[in-house]
A protein has these predicted regions:
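Central hydrophobic cores of alpha-helical transmembrane segments
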Residues: 30-35, 222-235
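Secretory targeting signals
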Residues: 39-49, 60-61, 76-132, 156-223, ...
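Membrane-interface helix starts
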Residues: 15-33
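Helix-loop-helix units of permease transmembrane domains in multi-pass membrane transporters
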Residues: 14, 132-164
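Terminal transmembrane helical anchor/hairpin motif
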Residues: 45-79, 90-107, 230-326
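Transmembrane alpha-helical segments in integral membrane proteins
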Residues: 116-137, 311-331
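Short, membrane-interfacial amphipathic segments enriched in basic
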Residues: 1-14
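Helix-capping/transition residues at the boundaries of transmembrane alpha-helices
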Residues: 20, 134, 145-147, 211, ...
Length: 334
């Protein structure tokens, strides 16, 4: 196969995946969800929250100290007394705030990533794309491509890669749009927020192969949806169990065999909690807005190793994709 032929096939795969994405019954809901997130970012307003760059001393005064010294004296020293609000949805939601504007933006972004690239955003992406493989294997393109001298494994991998491309395009619109809307609304441009796009794509690559395998095995969209959500939930529970064991006392910890089994499962499966912690660290919010205590302790003690977590998660996805390709070689499935 020449390079031009490969690109032509990938172009066909990507075009078909885009068609499936737009034709999906979830596409209108996806558009509404994305518009809602971007609108929420665009309507952020700050009341009485200054920028840290406006002060020589980038720190705020505690309430007790402010009451003792007085607002005027603090202002002379370059230390502001902040008693502001974060306002969302044109003021419908108000959150009291006592830190600088940059901190308020990081706080909002730390909440935003939960709905764009972390748990909610990833699960939405898995549900949206779950039907692509079953539909592809029963459709026109699959039957046409099988007439060419191409292996079924190559076609499945090409289709999967095209779905990752489609997901990435949507991620650029959702995360990029949210970042631009928030930057225009607040005049604070935090480039670290864009790490959430990379984490979304990597997480999708790690978890979507389970949906590919289930779709290949069952040819059912519903099985792929339920199975991929269940797979994510199992991975989350295993990840949480390991972190809990690390932070537990001797009396509270599991038995030796249980710990051993949990560790094997942890290193074998993708690690959603690790991804959340890694993203928080990349965005620079992990200490300012820390995760649950057990998670933070595991991170600070070096028990969560970013490169090892991501690497082993990607290896597990490769293994699942290999099983998916083997499933297609079953004569009954072809």
């Amino acid at each position: 196969m020449t390079g031009s032929q490969f690109l032509q096939i990938m172009k066909c795969f990507t075009g078909e995946s885009l068609r499936q994405a737009v034709a999906s019954y979830l596409f209108p809901l996806l558009l509404f969800y994305s518009a809602l997130i971007i609108t929420l970012a665009a309507t952020v307003r700050f009341s009485n929250i200054p920028e840290a760059s406006s002060y020589e001393i980038a720190q705020r005064a505690p309430k007790e100290e402010a009451a003792r010294v007085g607002k005027e004296e603090l202002e002379k020293s370059g230390i502001p007394l902040i008693q502001g609000e974060i306002r969302l949805l044109f003021g419908a939601v108000k959150i009291p705030w006592v830190k600088f504007r940059e901190s308020a933006v990081r706080y909002f972004e730390s909440m935003l990533v939960f709905f764009t690239s972390d748990a909610v955003g990833l699960i939405f992406a898995l549900i949206w794309t779950a039907g692509f493989i079953p539909e592809f294997l029963q459709g026109f393109w699959w039957n046409m491509l099988r007439l060419r001298p191409l292996s079924t494994g190559f076609m499945l991998l090409g289709k999967t890669f095209s779905i990752v491309i489609v997901l990435s395009l949507h991620g650029i619109i959702l995360i990029g749009g949210s970042w631009i809307a928030l930057g225009i609304a607040t005049n604070v441009w935090n480039g670290l927020f864009l790490w959430s796009f990379a984490i979304l794509v990597v997480q999708f690559i790690c978890f979507y192969p389970a949906s590919v395998f289930l779709g290949t095995w069952s040819r059912s969209t519903m099985v792929a949806i339920i199975g991929s959500i269940a797979f994510w939930a199992i991975c989350w529970m295993v990840n949480h169990a390991r972190i809990s064991n690390l932070s537990a006392t001797t009396a509270e910890s599991s038995s030796g065999v249980a710990i051993w089994l949990i560790d094997i499962a942890y290193w074998t499966l993708p690690k959603p909690i690790d991804f959340s912690i890694i993203l928080s660290d990349l965005m620079g919010t992990i200490k300012e807005f820390p995760p649950p205590t057990a998670w933070m302790n595991a991170f600070e003690t070096g028990n969560i190793m970013p490169f090892a977590s991501i690497g082993t998660s990607l290896i597990s996805s490769v293994v699942v994709l290999w099983f998916s390709c083997m499933e297609l070689k079953d004569p009954i499935k072809e």
